[in-house]
Swiss-Prot record:
InterPro entries referenced in this protein's UniProt entry, alphabetically: Sphingomy_SMPD4
Example GO biological process: cellular response to tumor necrosis factor
Modified residues (Phosphothreonine): 665
Topology in membrane: Single-pass membrane protein
Keywords from the named record: Cell membrane, Endoplasmic reticulum, Golgi apparatus, Hydrolase, Lipid metabolism, Magnesium, Membrane, Metal-binding, Nucleus, Phosphoprotein, Transmembrane, Transmembrane helix
Cellular component terms per the entry's GO annotation: endoplasmic reticulum; endoplasmic reticulum membrane; Golgi apparatus; Golgi membrane; nuclear envelope; sarcolemma; trans-Golgi network
Coarse class of the protein's main subcellular location: endoplasmic reticulum
Residues spanning the membrane: 776-796
Role summary: Catalyzes the hydrolysis of membrane sphingomyelin to form phosphorylcholine and ceramide. It has a relevant role in the homeostasis of membrane sphingolipids, thereby influencing membrane integrity, and endoplasmic reticulum organization and function. May sensitize cells to DNA damage-induced apoptosis. In skeletal muscle, mediates TNF-stimulated oxidant production.
Matches recorded under Pfam families: mit_SMPDase
Organism of this sequence: Mus musculus
Top enzyme class: hydrolase
The protein's name in its UniProt record: Sphingomyelin phosphodiesterase 4
Length: 823
């Protein structure tokens, strides 16, 4: 009788797979709810991996599953509500997870699908620096290949859920999906609110049915005691702590799901950078333990550990986060700040920390510094260094700024909403700023370097500079950052080898030092060394080097403001605002027209006004942050004004003055390539020999050139005699037969202008204007209009000639001498 019972799970799985193809989505979910309620865990065990994969898609991205990243309530309301009810933290799927959790089932998760650094580290037989992987790695007898993690149902579900964000292919650009409206984003928010509550405690696991077995309050692998939490908890201690049982402390079971969820999200979403960087961040003490553990594992497997170069070779794929990925990480950071700030004042005080507190309260204190800070810093560095120089960087920027402002998510923030003035950053946030110093200073410098390479005339780029400047200009924030830098730069005079013990913080180490300042200095140094290594070279944010960069940015802001004003003037004077009659005038298009300026020409005056407003406020904020004087900013404006041409509109590319003139800087080359700036260069040669334009008929221009050249050679003497007369006929001939006076042109060198000495040419006739498409079109239109009034071609031609002669006589009378007239 055992045979049919053993075949039952396979039959159930086959039935569900068939239903997934034949039944509609809502009906399938209803059937799954009944299956979860009616069948015991032993029969659901085989269904669970298939169900998870069918929901979140395969780890290789081939199967999309329910496609939660594109599922929106306003587009597919029925499917959206059904999926959200099924996957809710209190929904049927989590009941299935808890039912399997109670029976202590494990599921294999392939190591090859983990983030690159973790995968390479495990394949090198090195335990990653995260409690999430302890006691879970299953090394095969042959070693090397086919590694798996033995995960409990909750871990397995969360691994798939988190990895589906990055394993699935990016959404098509043709799909207009707002990330905040999609089902995946909403589920992340619900899971964070459920397992990281800002009020009350974590809800207990739900029993799947009254007759079923209730889930165990403890996971298969117990969470480590929070007494061992620190900036860098010992790997060996963590390894030992995971060997022990926590059944003696039932209160610690309250937060194991919260801890697991946070670790999974951080590891899957933030742990993406080179293995070399990962190893660089390890403290010397941790590296010794890693080496000891690697030797132990290698000895147990009877095979030598792979060298680190092979691990680095195995991790060669470059990881580029998507905008959707960054937005989800920002949601995580905002919720973590609210979660950590939900501690009551008496619980958050150091004195309360020394007394007995609940595991959830300890977790609130340790969540950000213990799990998030290090990986987020390197993740942000990667984004700042590799993200394209376009407006999509706004997502990364807002994620960074959200982390820098935990006070925005504090409970007292609600009472500040009605005050339009920026509130002073309280001194109680000084420890957070000091322990996250590099997040403020080094990443600010990285942003400066990006801003110096972007087109600040674009309103989106101007907005990003404004946002950063506004955040750092909050009252008292710059002072606290500067105080943190002073603490880090404080010389170490007491313990010469203190840097080797920065990552084993104990009371015995701190006791011989002065109580307040040295302790704060020690924490800042610990933070910097843990993220950058002990051989890092720190550049102060308020030092002379960064101040030079800020002045450079201020100069670019001033340039951008002037360019925006110039574009605004050109917008008013653009051809779209000219009259129809002015378009009908004969003549060539300006041969020295400038490059296409900026997308502002197409956006309009409103965006130009916003750009000027953003840049003006950003400049003021930078002046407040770095205490720039009005004289310095005025000097920048004066220096820029001297580099502009006579009409006060066009600006030169960025350059320096050398011995032989101006030399382009890298920024200047960037400005020329992108059409942001140009040198004012005019054609100085024979106007008749200019290249044929796209608006001209090539064969006709060449024929007219040969005809006019023959006429000029044949009648050169007569034309010269006519133009030399001092009467009206002479002025009339000079108006038509004299070319532009080359003696009035200049070599437009910004360093020094000098006149050009060119040999004078005699009067000559130019018929090139007749080779223009526009001229021929106007003539055809004139003949067509004349035909409507029953005027023949010959009569129309005579009228056109007569009209032009009258126009030329009027222009001759108004002209004192021959003027520049390009035909």
């Amino acid at each position: 009788m055992a045979f049919p019972h053993l075949q039952q799970p396979s039959f159930l799985l086959a039935s569900l797979k068939a239903d997934s193809i034949n039944k509609p989505f809502a009906q399938r979910c209803q059937d799954l709810v009944k299956v979860i309620e009616d069948f015991p865990a032993k029969e659901l065990h085989a269904v669970f991996p298939w169900l998870v994969e069918s929901i979140f898609g395969s780890l290789d991205g081939v199967l999309v599953g329910w496609n939660l990243r594109c599922l929106q309530g306003r587009v597919n309301p029925v499917e959206y509500s059904t999926a959200m009810e099924f996957l809710d933290p209190s929904g049927p799927m989590m009941k299935l997870v808890y039912k399997l959790q109670a029976e202590d089932y494990n599921f294999d998760f392939p190591v090859s699908c983990l983030p690159g650094p973790v995968k390479a580290s495990i394949q090198e037989n090195v335990l990653p620096d995260s409690p999430l992987y302890h006691n879970k790695v299953q090394f095969p007898p042959t070693g090397g290949l086919g590694l798996n993690l033995a995960l409990n149902p909750f871990e397995y579900y969360m691994f798939y859920f988190a990895l589906s964000l990055i394993s699935q292919k990016p959404m098509s650009m043709t799909l207009h999906v707002r990330t905040s409206d999609c089902a995946y984003f909403t589920l992340v928010d619900r899971y964070l609110s459920w397992f990281l509550p800002t009020e009350g405690s974590v809800p207990p696991p739900l029993c799947s049915s009254p007759g079923g077995s209730s889930p165990s309050p403890a996971p298969r692998t117990p969470a480590m005691p929070f007494a061992s939490y620190g900036l860098h908890t010992s790997l060996l201690k963590r390894h030992i702590s995971h060997q022990t049982s926590v059944n003696a402390d039932p209160a610690s079971h309250e937060i194991w799901r919260s801890e697991t969820l946070l670790q999974v999200f951080v590891e899957m979403w933030l742990h993406h950078y080179s293995l070399e960087m990962y190893q660089k961040m390890q403290s010397p003490h941790a590296k010794l333990e890693v080496l000891h553990y690697r030797l132990t594992v290698s000895s147990a497997l009877h095979s030598p550990a792979q060298p680190s170069l092979q691990a680095l070779h195995a991790y060669q794929e470059s990881f580029t986060p998507t905008e959707e990925h960054v937005l989800v990480v920002r949601l995580l950071l905002k919720h973590l700040h609210a979660f950590a700030n939900s501690l009551k004042p008496d619980q958050a005080s150091p004195s309360a920390h020394s007394h007995a507190t609940s595991p959830l309260e300890e977790f609130k204190r340790a969540a950000v510094p213990r799990f998030v800070q290090q990986k987020l810093y390197v993740f942000l560095q990667h984004c700042f260094g590799h993200w394209p120089l376009d407006a999509t960087f706004r997502a990364v920027l807002e994620m960074w700024l959200s982390y820098l402002q935990p006070w925005r998510y504090a409970p007292e923030k609600q009472a500040q909403g009605s005050d339009p003035q920026p509130r002073c950053v309280s001194e109680k946030w000084a420890p957070f700023i000091q322990e996250n110093l590099l997040m403020y200073t080094k990443l600010f410098v990285s942003f400066l370097n990006r801003a110096l390479r972007t087109d600040l005339v674009s309103p989106k780029n101007a907005l990003m500079v404004f946002r950063v400047a506004k955040v750092f200009a909050q009252p008292n924030l710059a002072e606290m950052i500067q105080k943190g830098e002073q603490l880090f730069l404080e010389p170490e005079l007491i313990i010469p080898h203190r840097q080797h013990r920065l990552f084993t913080v104990t009371t015995s180490f701190l006791s011989p030092w002065p109580p307040v300042v040295t302790d704060a200095s020690f924490k800042v140094k610990s933070h910097v060394y843990s993220l950058e290594g002990q051989d890092c070279k720190y550049t102060p944010m308020f030092g002379p080097e960064i101040r030079t960069l800020v002045l450079r940015l201020a100069q670019l802001i001033t340039q951008a403001k002037q360019t925006a004003k110039s574009i605004s003037d050109q917008y008013v004077e653009s051809p779209t605002g000219r009259s129809f009659l002015s378009w009908l005038t004969f003549g060539l298009t300006d041969t020295n027209s400038c490059y296409p300026a900026n997308d502002l020409d197409e956006i309009g005056q409103d965006s130009i006004r916003k750009t000027d407003e953003y840049l003006e406020k950003a400049l003021e904020y930078l002046r407040q942050i770095f205490r720039l004087s009005e004289a310095q900013l005025a000097q920048l404006t004066l220096a820029l004004g001297s580099a502009r041409d006579e009409n006060g509109k066009q600006q030169l590319p960025d350059c320096i003055v050398g011995e032989e003139g101006l030399i382009l800087t890298p920024l200047g080359r960037y400005q020329i390539i992108n059409g942001l700036r140009r040198f004012e260069i005019e054609y100085q040669g024979d106007l008749e020999l200019q290249p044929i334009r796209s608006y001209e008929i090539t064969s006709l221009v060449r024929a007219l050139f040969r005809l006019s050249s023959a006429i000029n050679r044949r009648f050169a003497g007569q034309m010269a005699a006519l133009c030399s007369r001092n009467d009206f006929l002479g002025s009339f001939c000079r108006y038509h037969l004299t070319e532009p006076a080359l003696s009035n042109r200049h070599l437009l060198s910004p360093v020094g202008r000098r006149q050009v000495t060119n040999p004078a040419r005699g009067p000559r006739l130019s018929l090139r204007f007749l080779g223009s498409y526009r001229t021929l079109l106007l003539l055809l239109m004139a003949f067509f209009v004349a035909s409507l009034f029953c005027i023949g071609p010959l009569s129309c031609s005579l009228l056109l000639v007569l009209g032009y002669v009258l126009y030329a006589i009027a222009m001759t009378l108004l002209t004192e001498r021959g003027k520049l007239h390009q035909l």
